[in-house]
UniProtKB/Swiss-Prot annotation:
This is tRNA modification GTPase MnmE. One of its GO terms (biological process) is tRNA methylation. It comes from the Bacteria. GO terms for cellular component: cytosol. Exhibits a very high intrinsic GTPase hydrolysis rate. Involved in the addition of a carboxymethylaminomethyl (cmnm) group at the wobble position (U34) of certain tRNAs, forming tRNA-cmnm(5)s(2)U34. Binds 1 potassium ion per subunit. It is found in: Cytoplasm.
Length: 454
């Protein structure tokens, strides 16, 4: 990426709208203002001005705001042109700006990337911008804003700072081995290390909640034909998302619904009934069902309670259980309690959760919702929380592993050198979250997923 270029892009969504915004950032932002507006607006004041073409004809009239660097979003000179949101008008204005030498269309996320490179925000905050735009619930939006304001980054910086001081202490013990006090055995280093480990575990717990808010949980409903899978999908979705009939095999393909349970995104997938296929279409549907099952976070094993009294999954359908990945969590759902003597309930059977409900009447659905929240460790009370991505969780987990290994080196091996190395690696892992230690390749992948105008 050439950061000496001046970049321009539409900051509002494509299509028609009341207002359309073009954003310019770079050393020629002031020149763009001079040629398009005929003047350089007073910094940080809104000016209502005509936007002119190369020949001086007025293309549009609107608001122009000039932010000289470094006091701007990107840290560079920034010009925003807010005109009417017609695609033709905005395209003409964009072409006019691009006639200037040294001005080009921005790459996806390049405005945010320049803000990061100019220390206007760290990497976790930059990612929070995209997460705020993509938020699918009020809770996710609030958590993304907390991240943007530094709720996550501040905690990471504090842990990095604590590790820095700890490393200084440890390396002093290594450099001055003849001191009267044995730094490695007097308990001070271990106490400080334990404090960081406890704090890291607290942040990891928050990050897991933030990851659930951002990415949600993939739940696949699977079972034999006519077990009530589509009825359960409709009950969870709160609408008639799937066709329901008494004919076995009504669902031939994968159906997806995205809902929220107290703020937790849930990706529910209804699948074709699993049996020996009667035709090619059904065979393909069953193959797709198994593909979804193998990629699920949890499987709801639907059982028609009018056909069996069994509650053990292996007893209900041994072939199904044999094919499931061993590490895949399942919940057995005995459906159609409205047609049997069973009461709606939840219990544990041989290590599996068993829920009795009626998808048709809705009895027991709240039990299932609470169960899904509990199994994912989701708490709806996340005030002050932040959003987290998979890479954040991976970095936190890596840091935790190095701190545990460092603790062993301190307590068991009494090796200052090995402890110092584990602390360094933990610090490096945490620094990857905020971008203090990050490869160019990772930066490219992160910012390329952003909107063009961000």
């Amino acid at each position: 990426m050439n950061t000496t270029d001046t970049i321009v892009a539409q900051a509002t969504p494509p299509g028609r709208g009341g207002v359309g915004i073009l954003r310019v950032s770079g050393p020629k932002a002031a020149q763009v203002a001079e040629v398009v507006l005929g003047k350089l607006p007073k910094p940080r004041y809104a000016d209502y001005l005509p936007f002119r073409d190369v020949d001086g004809q007025i293309l549009d009239q609107g608001i122009a705001i000039y932010f000289p660097g470094p006091n701007s979003f990107t840290g560079e000179d920034v010009l925003e042109l807010q005109g009417h949101g017609g695609p033709v008008i905005l395209d003409l204005l964009l072409k006019r700006i691009l006639t200037l030498s040294g001005v080009r269309i921005a790459n996806p996320g390049e405005f945010s990337e320049r803000a990061f490179l100019n220390d206007k925000l760290d990497l976790a905050q930059a990612e929070a911008i995209a997460d705020l735009i993509d938020a699918s619930s009020e809770q996710a939006a609030r958590s993304a804003m907390n991240s943007l304001q530094g709720a996550f980054s501040t905690q990471v910086h504090q842990m990095v700072e604590a590790l820095t001081h700890l490393r200084i202490y440890v390396e002093a013990a290594i450099d001055f081995p003849d001191e009267e006090i044995d730094f490695l055995s007097d308990g001070k280093i271990e106490a400080k290390l334990d404090e960081v480990i406890v704090e890291l575990e607290r942040v990891r717990s928050q990050a897991r909640q933030g990851s659930l808010l951002r990415e949600g949980m993939k739940v696949v409903i699977a079972g034999r034909p006519n077990a009530g899978k589509s009825s359960l999908l409709n009950a969870l979705a709160g609408r008639e998302a799937a066709i329901v009939t008494d004919i076995a095999g009504t669902t031939r393909d994968v159906l997806r619904e995205h809902i929220h349970i107290d703020g937790m995104p849930l990706h529910i997938i209804d699948t074709a009934g699993l049996r020996e296929a009667s035709d090619e279409v059904e065979r393909i549907g069953i193959e797709r069902a198994w593909q979804e099952i193998e990629q699920a976070d949890r499987v709801l094993f639907m059982v028609d309670s009018t056909t069996t009294n069994a509650v053990e999954p292996v007893e209900i359908w041994p072939e199904f259980m044999a094919r499931l990945p061993k590490s895949l969590p399942i919940t057995v759902v005995r459906n159609k309690t409205d047609m049997t003597d069973e009461e709606t309930s939840i219990a544990e059977v041989s290590g599996y959760s068993l829920i009795r409900l009626s998808a048709r009447s809705g009895e027991g659905i709240d039990l299932l919702r609470d169960h899904l929240k509990e199994t994912m460790g989701f708490s709806s009370n996340t005030e002050g929380g932040f959003l987290a991505r998979r890479r954040h969780l991976q970095a936190l987990n890596t840091a935790a592993e190095h701190l545990q290994q460092g603790h062993e080196q301190l307590v068991v091996a009494r090796s200052g050198e090995l402890l110092a190395e584990e602390l360094r690696l933990a610090q490096q892992a945490l620094s990857e979250i905020t971008g203090e230690f990050t490869s160019d390749d990772l930066l490219g992948r992160i910012f390329s997923s952003f909107c063009i105008g961000k």
